[in-house]
């Protein structure tokens, strides 16, 4: 069956799952040429199997608030593919969470993990619970109830969740504590843990650090030095924090961060104590970035707008999926940028991606450029299994090597006849080939 026929069937079958279909369509269009060169893939129905999760777990999560009132949320764990290793992927606590988003993230995670060179399958999970405005005690009770069901399906050699939006160090601690109590085992069943109980150094910064290593590699393909370049960043969570920190260390100047309320423009650059203040804003639970302008003179808060209107050399999406649309892409292209990177998962709409690629713009897709987070999670798994702890320099060196390797895979499969590197195609084909070959070797399962 041709790729187009498979895609049409999926669009009919999953018509109510737009995010999942968007992710699947991007991958299938990218890999159709290489897929057609392998008739054995079609015979084994690789695409049909690859686009269907191995397991979808949905469950209720009852919990009580501080007033004693009962609430019920929905929990998810989509175990998408385990062909190259145990399931691996984050947990997201946010009101927007639904099955379509969990499936899209699990599908993307499968290819992202394949690119890291580490033995990790793809999964994603979470709940439509919001931590905003909730006390520590309420968050703890929710996490304990969530783990009460999830623990049946995870383990260090089965499925190893991590954090994501709404799930930081506090939540991972509560989840791990409940898992330990239920199983009476101290295992590396979660990553993103605190340093005191099996966590890896640099894990909070890893996604942002890895993204800048990848962006730097992209710029070097055109003999461009990142030093002195201006950077527009969206978001103000861990991903943005890590990206700002590493961009500054590499000699670039970050001039924006953003939140649901608008964005901050700081022409003097966001670094040092300004960058650390971002974490205070995020920890406040208010989900707004406006207070930054009150804290630091010379900066300006622009309410209700996106940071893409600012002219810069490099643009990084670090907030959430589909935050950058076609109109935003036109605006960015009018600034004549050097590079755009999708540091958030599927941070750009399909229309935006198409515009960047058609313009022959240096564009990094999320599954490649933001793989540093899960790569460092994989390094945490390794440290837990070996019962040892690596230094900051050791972890950073391994992360740098992994991102360099991912960039190499993208250029191998994405370089076009005219010399343009289509990183979207390169990442998709590289990830697909590894997973497909593993599935072929393991039979029809």
Where do the protein language model's features map onto the residues?
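Adenosine-phosphate binding glycine-rich loop
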Residues: 2-23, 218, 333-445
